[in-house]
Amino acid sequence: MGHKVNPVGMRLQINRTWDSRWYADTKDYGDLLLEDIKIREFIKEECKQAGVARVIIERPHKKCRVTIHTARPGVIIGKKGADIEVLRKKIASMTDSELHLNIVEVRKPELDAQLVGESIAQQLERRVSFRRAMKRAVQNAMRMGALGIRVNVAGRLGGAEIARTEWYREGRVPLHTLRADIDYAHSEASTPYGIIGIKVWIFKGEIMEHDPQARDRKAQELQDGPAPRGAGGNRRGDR
């Protein structure tokens, strides 16, 4: 079963949580959900060159907090913050709530499945060999500390008449293990021969805590390093 379902959805409420974090009454739910979709699609199109990995939307009371995880924050922020102000105004016009926009840097894009998939897609659109693009992505991920990675590409590879699927894997990718921290994403490359689909699974280790926020905390530690410990071995802020 682990090979049939989305690894992200399968692990929700076990060791990871949703990218949309809010509650609404039945009468407002549809409108807010549509608003989320429009905001995500707009950011994906507007910040295409910035390498957007995730967009997290939270809605505390009468507010809308949008957090963009990106590999190139400077592209979004712009010179002296000019570009981010333009982006903030455009997103604010799409919602009636008070908008708060945050930018978070992804310091290891080689370990983010979405960014890896988009990188492969861009290479395929530039007519780079699909085998070379896949192998480069796998080698970079393993070099940066991944315990395993699998990449699938499907379509008219190399302009072939008949579509086929090719995959490349290195290390372990235990899809059946629910405590496994597996990042998954899919992308598409638009080529002269048609659309090529790309799927990426990256295994980063195991999360022993049964906590939806555990994966986010682990990702933050990988970015910033473990929090300093005080006397008694406790991390500062744990008390």
From Swiss-Prot:
Biased composition annotated in UniProt, kind: Gly residues: 230-239
Gene Ontology MF annotations: mRNA binding; rRNA binding; structural constituent of ribosome
Pfam families listed in its UniProt record: KH_2, Ribosomal_S3_C
SUPFAM superfamilies: Prokaryotic type KH domain (KH-domain type II), Ribosomal protein S3 C-terminal domain
One record GO biological process: translation
Chain positions covered by the region annotation Disordered: 212-239
GO CC annotation: cytosolic small ribosomal subunit
CDD domains registered for this protein in UniProt: KH-II_30S_S3
SMART domains, sorted: KH
UniProt keywords, alphabetically: Ribonucleoprotein, Ribosomal protein, RNA-binding, rRNA-binding
Domain of life of the source: Bacteria
PANTHER family xref list: 30S/40S RIBOSOMAL PROTEIN S3, SMALL RIBOSOMAL SUBUNIT PROTEIN US3C
Recorded family membership: Belongs to the universal ribosomal protein uS3 family.
Function according to Swiss-Prot or TrEMBL: Binds the lower part of the 30S subunit head. Binds mRNA in the 70S ribosome, positioning it for translation.
Protein name: Small ribosomal subunit protein uS3
Organism of provenance: Ruegeria sp. (strain TM1040)
Gene: rpsC
